[in-house]
Amino acid sequence: MMRAALALARRSLGRTWPNPAVGCVIVRDGHVLARGRTQDGGRPHGEADAIAHAAGSLKGATAYVTLEPCSHQGRSSPCADALVEAGVARVVSALQDPDPKVDGRGHARLKAAGIAVEVGEGAVEATEINAGFLMRLRHGRPLFHLKIAASLDGHTATAGGHSKWITGPAARADGHRLRATHDAILVGANTVAADDPDLTCRLPGLERYSPVRIVLDSKGGLSPDSRLVRSAREVPLWLVCTEIDSSREYLLREAGADVIRVVGRQGRVDVTAAAQELGKRGLTRVLVEGGATVASAFLKAELIDRLSVYRGGLMMGADSRSAVGPLGLAGLDFAPRFSLVSTSIVGGDTLETWRKAS
């Protein structure tokens, strides 16, 4: 049953920030009585959602939850209290919640009410699902996931800037699915200037799950006529800059964009400072989509935690544009390293998923 709860939690990724994505399945005598997951915007929590949809009494049942039930009064009542009031006899949690507001208190509340508590089943997968939430708690920043679509020899465009299309329709659709599982998409000013992108999720049924669009632009030069700005009231747009002309800032804010100032470094946005600011705003999972300058900045700052590489079956040569800008490595000992998680075939292309090496 924990696997079912974990699957429910995965369905909520990208939709619950700043809260974690939690799944809950409640069973008795081998029969599922209720299912729930954290809903969009982080409320209701997974346990409360399951209890609200229960067909009948939950007395004597077992609740499988992917994270310790909360015990503090926030915008809603504590989930630990809701489970006690529902009459469950046993709670199986994948993880103890390290949030200082919880941190074992939820389990203690359950035990005090005579409910049996077990912790640890499904812990590895639950940790991965909420890696962004845990990253923000422990380091004050979101998890950053770099997505690259490249040729077999690691290039993303010809010398003249032609890039449509390196990968096929299936891989591009999967990239939109990936967007829907993140709180935000991040690109640099060069990508916006070259492509004038929408940065939305354009898969049928997932359009409303388009994440926050973030643009790093040190001089705040984002055009009010760009597609991003024109759609800022439909899909949130955040401009992260070190400085900006006051008249342009006024136009951007009037269009619905949010302007965020951070410190600079060598004439560019300091990505470490930007990461902390995004964490303060509640983001837990950010998909970094480019371009090469942004990718290298995040890699040099050791901020990339996950990496997805879609590879198309073509060679482009050394005169083409690289997926990653210069890293200035003094030797291989200084190279960012990742551990392979999985390789899959997506249409006629491949997808490699990597995790930052520990």
What kind of region is each of these model predictions?
Residues 1-19, 75, 143-145, 150-358:
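Enzymes that bind and transform nitrogen-containing heteroaromatic metabolites
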Residues 99, 103, 119-122, 137-141, ...:
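Short capping loops/turns at secondary-structure boundaries
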Residues 14-18, 43, 107, 121-149:
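Proteins enriched for Cys/Gly/acidic motifs involved in redox and nucleic-acid/cofactor modification
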Residues 54, 111-112, 137-139, 306-307, ...:
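Short alpha-helix boundary/capping motifs
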Residues 26-125, 212, 238, 242-243, ...:
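Zn2+-dependent cytidine deaminase-like catalytic core
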